[in-house]
Amino acid sequence: MDYSTRPDARILYDTLVPIWPDRGSALSYRNCFELLIAVILSAQCTDEQVNKVTPALFEAYPTPGDLAEASLADVESLVRTTGFFRAKAANIVGAATIIARDLGGTVPDTIEELVKLPGVGRKTANLIVSVCFGKPGIVVDTHVLRTARRLGLAPTDDPGKS
């Protein structure tokens, strides 16, 4: 069944949009590259904490090429307070390296290309294609998926199949 055309899904959508018309991100960013890096850093961290870290990070490394050339130790020290800082530093340097080296410095505009980047899963990819490129994409975390499943709007708890 195509869940996007269910009448109850439309009712839910039509009810929620007026309540939350501005569904933008709480993360601070100036371009798609900054949003991508901020979203990677936001895993298991509050947007508020990410917003405290990113100004210094983007001042030091404003482009994918700059971040790709950064020492891992320097990036780790800048993102330390976001938790899991070693993995996050490796992921953002890795993503920046691929973007700079293989993609001409441009953030990919498809989910398929985005999920190839270190630290990027479907949730992050959907957010980027939706916010940056205006393409349809629904950002679904475990809480949204669980609620959608309980409401009968999602057929499974598997995010890849919902």
Annotate each PLM feature.
Residues D2-S162:
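Catalytic cores of DNA base-excision repair glycosylases
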